[in-house]
Amino acid sequence: MYEEPYRWVEAVGNRRQYLDEQFKQGSPVVALTYDGGILLTTVSKGTPKLYEIYDRLALGGMGHPTDLEKLRFSLLEMAHVEGFNRSPSDVTGSRLVKYGIAPVIKQAFEEVYKAPFIVRILVAELGQKPEKDALLTINYDGTFEETTGCAVLAATPVAQTKMTAYLKEQTPATLSLEQGLDLSLRAWAIGSLAHQQEESDQRAEAEPTKTGAGSSTAAIPSADVLMEHVRGIAGGRTIECAILERQAPGTSKYRALKPADLSRLLPKALQSVVVS
């Protein structure tokens, strides 16, 4: 009887290791506020990772497509029930995360005899004014964080930290959609390269004959190098972008950027990888 709490703690630790492993091949997600609203960007393998949730709410995700789809439908249902029973203005990202989806993810994670959700989620909320914009991220254990300006999902905490630091350092006072897309893709490349570097460092540490292993403090690559990395990866994938547009007509502010939009907005080095 006295061993049960320790077994539970050990089981939770094992679940963390298992879940961390599942995200190693995941594609980062970047959310960034720009002059006209909020931009979400990722590079997907075919299954969409960006969705509309409600009039002023968007979702980005990493993880197992089935789990992501299940939670997306849960968010959709919660948002529309809330909007019907109360009012559309009461449907906020904060309420949906804090009182809706985060407790569900937390419960699944802590029930060690059931499968957890293999997901990391980003919820973007477009405010009536720019200062009211909100970005929320939820980890696979149900913990969440609310930020402004930018937010990311990444394979590892190290990659996430590097992406966030890069965005905060590179974001100017004013940012057009075209500039925001360029910056988001560079931040995506930072996350992708950071994870590759972590794996390289781990392999080097496992080979004691090699010296000079570990380069986690390496300088940030130039913009050209970052874009070349995106170009190399995106050739077999899809650059996926969506915006919450403050001045869009109607109640729904969500719009997925089509290939024609991307061909106009992407840097010249990447325009050839957009497939209509």
Please name every model-derived segment.
Residues 1-276:
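Long, low-complexity N-terminal extensions
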